[in-house]
């Protein structure tokens, strides 16, 4: 994902803090080129995606569980969780459906709003729909946040203080990260993040 640097940092931190006397860890790298176990000497061994196993020196290695450290897609959007559900491997994170809902900001906001939680007014843009963009946000109060609808770590996000050209520039920036962009009114208040598992 576009969040690879953050993912690698997370994975290193997890690996450093797991007790080696209790757990044998394997670094699995998921890239556009494939899925690989990367050994300490940087040798790469392909992952058999039929059962999420690796072959090292002719010996098949299967795993007891997966510690997901991959930010963005496919690590936070339900795709990886769904895969591990299919192969029957337990993993650390919420399930596939919950991941998919929370990764899509528009859907997560709709679910929260339906539950009676106050949410910011927003407009969703799809790639190629930038005609009349000023009109589409005319009912919003500025400042607004412009962000990729699917993604995290604030990549591609901008705060836009007033209407005009800066909004168009922020939309273009966000569209570099996703095919859907959310323009959302700013809510003044304190922000809390609570991890629930």
Which residues fall in each region the model found?
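ATP-binding N-terminal substructure of ATP-dependent carboxylate-amine bond-forming enzymes
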Residues: 1-97, 101-103, 107, 126-135
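Anion (oxyanion) recognition and catalysis
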Residues: 19, 85, 113, 138, ...
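Short, hinge-like loop/turn segments at secondary-structure boundaries
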Residues: 42-46, 110-113, 138-140, 163
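Short, glycine-/small-residue-rich phosphate/pyrophosphate-handling segment
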Residues: 103-123
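ATP-grasp fold ATP-binding core
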Residues: 112-113, 137-157, 178-192
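Short acidic-hydrophobic, aromatic-tinged amphipathic segments that line or gate anion-handling sites
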Residues: 123-127, 158-163
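Phosphate-binding site of ATP-dependent enzymes
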Residues: 162-197
């Amino acid at each position: 994902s576009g969040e690879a640097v953050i993912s690698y940092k997370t994975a290193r931190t997890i690996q450093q803090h797991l007790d080696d006397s209790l757990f044998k860890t394997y670094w699995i790298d998921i890239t556009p080129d494939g899925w690989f176990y990367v050994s300490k000497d940087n040798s790469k061994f392909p992952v058999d995606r039929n059962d999420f196993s690796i072959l090292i020196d002719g010996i098949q290695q299967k795993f007891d569980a997966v510690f997901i450290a991959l930010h963005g897609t496919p690590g936070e959007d339900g795709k990886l969780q769904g895969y591990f559900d299919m192969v029957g491997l337990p993993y650390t994170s919420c399930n596939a459906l919950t991941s998919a809902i929370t990764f899509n900001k528009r859907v997560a906001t709709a679910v929260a709003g339906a539950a009676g939680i106050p949410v910011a007014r927003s407009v969703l843009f799809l790639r190629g729909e930038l005609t009349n963009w000023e009109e589409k946000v005319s009912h919003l109060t500025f400042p607004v946040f412009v962000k990729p609808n699917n993604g995290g770590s604030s990549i591609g996000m901008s705060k836009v203080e007033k209407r005009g050209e800066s909004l168009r520039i922020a939309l273009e920036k966000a569209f570099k990260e996703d095919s859907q962009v959310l323009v959302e009114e700013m809510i003044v208040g304190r922000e809390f993040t609570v991890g629930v598992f």
